[in-house]
Amino acid sequence: MKKSENLDLITIGRSSVDLYGSQIGGRLEDMRTFQKYIGGSPTNIAAGAARLGLKSAIITRVGNEHMGRFIVEQLKKEGVNTDGFKIDQERLTALVILGIRNKNDFPLIFYRENCADMALSTNDIDKKFISCLLYTS
């Protein structure tokens, strides 16, 4: 991995695909259609920072499958540096299914057992790449 060049922010941690139920106000049990988004606090922060004009990057793991490629491609479109991504050949990308009932209630189900980002380790971090780090949980 190359040294980070003038990055304002590097996040590290969870990357997932969030599937939001399109029928706002309904129960998850009743959802028929979903919209697909990138998810995970570090992923969302990196994308949001890029939208605000900052040079951001993320260190994470995703699976070598459709959902993992979706996250990488979406972040590249947002202008996020993805040099810190590790592609996991054995694990799938995390998935979250969510609904929006009202402003205070949003049911969700995490599919994260043995997923790629849960296998992220210190060995995945190139010290030359890090210039700053924001920890979120």
Would you name each region that the model predicts?
Residues 88-90, 94-114:
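Glycine-rich nucleotide/cofactor/substrate-binding loop typically near the N-terminus or early
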Residues 122-132:
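Short amphipathic alpha-helix with an adjacent loop that forms part of the alpha/beta core around
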Residues 13, 60, 84, 99, ...:
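Pocket-edge structural micro-motifs
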Residues 2-4, 26, 89-90, 100-103, ...:
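Solvent-exposed alpha-helices and their adjacent loops that cap or buttress functional pockets
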Residues 2-80, 108, 120-123:
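Glycine-rich phosphate/adenosyl-contacting loop at the front of the ribokinase-like
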Residues 115-119:
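A generic, well-ordered mixed alpha/beta core segment in the N-terminal half of proteins
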Residues 135-136:
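Conserved small/polar residues in nucleotide/adenosyl-binding loops
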Residues 61-63, 83-91:
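Beta-strand->loop->alpha-helix junctions that form or flank phosphate-binding loops
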